[in-house]
Amino acid sequence: MASNPMKPDPFPDALGHRRKVWFSGVLLACVAMLSPEGARTQESPQPGATLASPAPEALEVDASLFTAQSFDWFDSQRQRPVPAKLYLPAAQAAAGTLPLVVFSHGIGGSRDGYSYLGRYFAAHGVGSLHVQHVGSDRQIWSGNPLTLPARLSDAAQVSEALHRVQDLRYALDQILAAPAGALFDTRRIVAAGHSYGANTTMLISGAQVEQQGQKLSLRDPRISAAILISAPPFYGMGDPSKILSGIDVPTLHITATEDVIQIPGYVSGLQDRMDIFNATGSERAVPKVLAVFKDGSHSIFTDRAGTGGVNLNPRVKIATRQLALAFLNGILARDYRAMDAWPRSHASLVARFEKLEP
């Protein structure tokens, strides 16, 4: 989405001049791997949740275990819509007891995407707020195909990367002020994202980038942990340790051996994800976890079916959300049993698993 010259840009040139600096190669590469997510927009929840995780487990989540509500917020300060969808447990929860995940989608996504995670989290007692970023969302795929490169270029601007962080902040402000906000334990708020959304998650969790010699810190102190799925590097910013070493919250990193972003002249593969894992929090004594699936693809972690292998795709999705929930229970409830058991339960799928504790 291009800037409106009649609107003031809250990110002036001194901080975010409009060049494709951090994300251009990564975003355009993601487009080569991803198409708009196929996610159903209709939810038909009914009461009666259980916190027990069935095993073996179907990918589809019982609709009686969660509710879903869409919001169409508008940030008047930035003159920017902030759509979102909130998944909640169907079972009644006491005030101040629910953890909350705030999820950021990849390029071309929407609030309806990554529903396999949102529904599952809610069915297991965790709220999940999926935020839509209007400057890099599914609108990219609409319009004249000949102008798609221009729309992608707009999505790759530094100002859009910064807007995405502000989208998460604004959505978090709004949901905590809403009636549902009373349900959440504000000490247990976790940021999560896939691909471009993982970059957004790193920024709101404490990653520090430089722009024209000025260091930008976009850390939101309400974030207590982060889940990074298929995280690309900060393109053109050099050593990731300079950006990520100061992150001071626990992190979960999920990728696959074939999690590769590739276009002519640019390749980002597993080693980039490993470099991000190694750099994250390297100056801090904070826990971090890495899971690398065998094979797969970059888009296997979206709602798309079949990518990365028709049989492998649902198995990786199920294992991903089980690990994410185990991470949340470990970090937020100090219950590490499920996380410790996870690599054994999914040994046939996992190429590498690391759990680093201070």
Which residues are covered by each model-predicted region?
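Cap/lid segment of the alpha/beta-hydrolase catalytic domain
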Residues: 134-163, 302-305
